[in-house]
């Protein structure tokens, strides 16, 4: 009995001392120089030739290095060399006074090395051939790059090159792309290569700052082509090899993904402090699907930075007397900082224009629905006012966006304010579309439309979907919501197996062409594998786009953009949705950074004070011990009578035995 009590007390003692931070979700000590964050769903690919989603590029931009990057500090955004010695030299080839080709001469820096990798037996130096090899991969039928459709219009010989590779793969399971020359991408010497494009395309330089044009060593391609690798799903999709400041140390998307410093990284200097970068040793991203647990871990100090969900907004943000967002007292007491930026992005609901009901020439149905979906209400209910209702594809901050150029199909001027048209206007359009009061003449019942969404398990999603059902119900339309896992959802959009769906776009580069191309027919998702997810086609819009894309940023270009916007607003392939305003919170141990809405390779500029973090985590996560002390007292009260009884019994027995 005495021994049992001793064991109970020991267990109680160790539970209150050794496990002082028993809610710490991390495997290693938080006093290490490691940045902690979260992700809610696994990226689909980390192949730089394929990755296009923001959750993918935020990872691979730390690993792969295209030739150019954005200056971290300058605004407006400006391109500068990354692996190049200088900005590309541009030469124009003319014929009869017309530019028929543009040639970019790119010279890379020597002594840039790849990360350690089993495909590279020695410390492998970056060479020009690696960049050319990657450009060739963009045309490979085994890669299916989403930018093939765009690049085939520009890179000389690109379309024919894809056909050549298609034929070659009919006879071989793997081919060395070095054996197949591409007219539009040629190696000049070890550190120099040329890219040749048709005509003039000023935005091409922006593409050279994207992961698509990062280098890929032939050895890595060969390594992953081995049958044993494919059988075990060991591919470049999941095991990147780059020259960047970080490498992927652990890739378990069902638990966590870990980026660690690349030991072969050449080293750069911070543009402000002049300290060596990168400064953070590791980035640990933990899978955390639910917004509330993510938020709680941030408040406990276990995540270093955080966004703000709708559930947490009121506890984090309040408005000052001028209506500007500021931190609540509780956030200020923790030393948390707030950063706000208007995101150069658009989130919209798309109509699959290949669908026989919502697509094609059924624009009055699309217009009716577009009027009905009250995005002003959506922004207040679910975004806490953190957004601007979209009138077209171009977001604020990008040339071509004009606050006073409203979408006249959906809005009208009410004094100095744009106001959404009344539901009566939408019902009239719906009747003209052949669905009076939302009745489908084929069935005599309410028109049923399918809305495909990704399944995240987020409680916010249920409320938003219920709200969306009510919006369609205003027209008498029944909305059938089809939940799909994220990767499967992307596949359904890619094959056109959707009717209505949510989609979004974050700017690749700060030019209106990067948003207007989302509605260019040659970028159709189903036919061309491009980023026109709605598969919208209109020859007039295409003609205007081809004019706008190469024009200088001036008044003439703005006039053409206005004409283009009026056309696509009339056709309504999108319910234009919202341009978000990003709110980011950082703990006091995270050094201030300058938000960059375009660049993704900014992890290297971040710095933390891990000792301060550990101290505050201990302060904020002290266990509440009084229930345990009450339990201890209760145990003592129970055990004392038992001990006394036990002692008396043992003592009595001893006396009896003695007198015998």
Regions inferred by a protein language model and the residue ranges of each:
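Ligand/substrate-recognition segments at binding pockets and active sites
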Residues: 100, 253-255, 419-423, 431-507, ...
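Long beta-strand-rich cores associated with HINT superfamily self-processing modules
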Residues: 586-621
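Extracytoplasmic/peripheral linker and loop segments enriched in polar/acidic and small residues
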Residues: 22-23, 28, 332-335, 342, ...
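Structural transition elements
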Residues: 246, 388-435, 455-463
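Gly/Pro-rich hinge or "lid" segments in bacterial periplasmic/extracellular proteins
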Residues: 71-74, 164-191, 196-282, 289-293, ...
């Amino acid at each position: 009995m005495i021994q049992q009590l001793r064991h109970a007390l020991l267990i109680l003692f160790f539970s209150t001392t050794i496990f002082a931070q028993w809610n710490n979700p991390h495997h290693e000590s938080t006093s290490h120089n490691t940045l902690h964050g979260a992700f809610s769903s696994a990226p689909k690919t980390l192949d730089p030739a394929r990755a296009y989603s923001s959750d993918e590029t935020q990872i691979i931009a730390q690993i792969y290095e295209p030739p150019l990057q954005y200056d971290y500090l300058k605004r407006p955004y400006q391109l500068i060399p990354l692996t190049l010695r200088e900005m590309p030299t541009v030469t124009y080839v003319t014929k009869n006074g017309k530019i028929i080709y543009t040639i970019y001469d790119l010279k890379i820096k020597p002594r840039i090395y790849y990360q350690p990798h089993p495909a590279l037996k020695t410390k492998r130096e970056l060479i020009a051939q690696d960049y050319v090899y990657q450009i060739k991969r963009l045309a490979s039928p085994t890669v299916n790059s989403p930018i093939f459709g765009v690049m085939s219009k520009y890179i000389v010989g690109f379309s024919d090159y894809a056909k050549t590779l298609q034929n070659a793969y009919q006879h071989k399971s793997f081919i060395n792309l070095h054996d197949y020359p591409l007219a539009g991408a040629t190696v000049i010497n070890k550190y120099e290569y040329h890219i040749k494009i048709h005509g003039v395309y000023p935005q091409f330089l922006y593409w050279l700052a994207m992961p698509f044009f990062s280098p890929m060593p032939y050895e890595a391609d060969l390594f992953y082509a081995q049958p044993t690798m494919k059988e075990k799903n060991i591919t470049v999709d999941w095991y990147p090899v780059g020259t960047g400041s970080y490498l992927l140390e652990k890739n378990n998307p069902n638990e966590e993904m870990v980026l660690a410093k690349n030991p072969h990284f050449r080293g750069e200097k911070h543009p402000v402090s002049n300290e060596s970068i990168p400064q953070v040793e590791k980035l640990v991203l933990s899978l955390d699907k639910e917004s509330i647990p993510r938020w709680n871990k941030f408040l406990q100090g276990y995540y270093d930075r955080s966004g703000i969900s709708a559930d947490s907004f009121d506890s984090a943000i309040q408005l000052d007397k001028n209506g500007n967002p500021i931190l609540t007292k509780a956030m200020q007491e923790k030393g948390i900082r707030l950063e706000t930026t208007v995101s150069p992005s658009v989130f919209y609901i798309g109509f699959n224009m290949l669908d026989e009901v919502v697509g094609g020439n059924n624009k009055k149905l699309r217009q009716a629905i577009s009027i009905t979906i009250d995005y002003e209400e959506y922004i207040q209910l679910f975004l806490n006012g953190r957004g601007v209702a979209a009138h077209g594809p171009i977001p604020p901050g990008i040339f071509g966006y004009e606050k006073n150029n409203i979408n006249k199909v959906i809005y009208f001027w009410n004094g100095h304010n744009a106001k959404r048209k009344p539901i009566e206007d939408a019902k009239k359009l719906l009747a003209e579309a052949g669905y009076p009061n939302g009745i489908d003449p084929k069935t005599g019942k309410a028109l049923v439309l399918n809305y495909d969404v990704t399944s995240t398990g987020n409680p916010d999603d249920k409320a938003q979907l219920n709200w969306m059902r009510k919006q369609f119900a205003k027209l008498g339309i029944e909305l059938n919501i089809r939940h799909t896992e994220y990767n499967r959802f992307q596949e359904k959009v890619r094959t056109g197996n959707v009717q209505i769906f949510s989609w979004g776009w974050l700017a690749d580069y700060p030019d209106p062409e990067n948003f207007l191309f989302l509605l260019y027919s040659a970028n159709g998702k189903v036919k061309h594998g491009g980023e026109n997810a709605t598969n919208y086609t209109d020859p007039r819009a295409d003609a205007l786009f081809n004019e706008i894309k190469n024009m200088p940023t001036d008044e003439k270009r703005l006039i053409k953009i206005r004409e283009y916007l009026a056309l696509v607003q009339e056709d309504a392939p999108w319910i234009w949705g919202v341009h978000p305003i990003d709110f980011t919170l950082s703990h006091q141990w995270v050094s201030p950074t300058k938000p960059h809405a375009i660049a993704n390779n900014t992890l290297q500029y971040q710095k933390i004070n891990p000792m301060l973090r550990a101290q505050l985590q201990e302060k904020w996560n002290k266990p509440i011990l009084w229930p345990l002390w009450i339990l201890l007292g209760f145990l003592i009260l129970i055990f004392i009578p038992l001990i006394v009884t036990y002692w008396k019994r043992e003592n009595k027995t001893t006396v009896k035995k003695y007198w015998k």
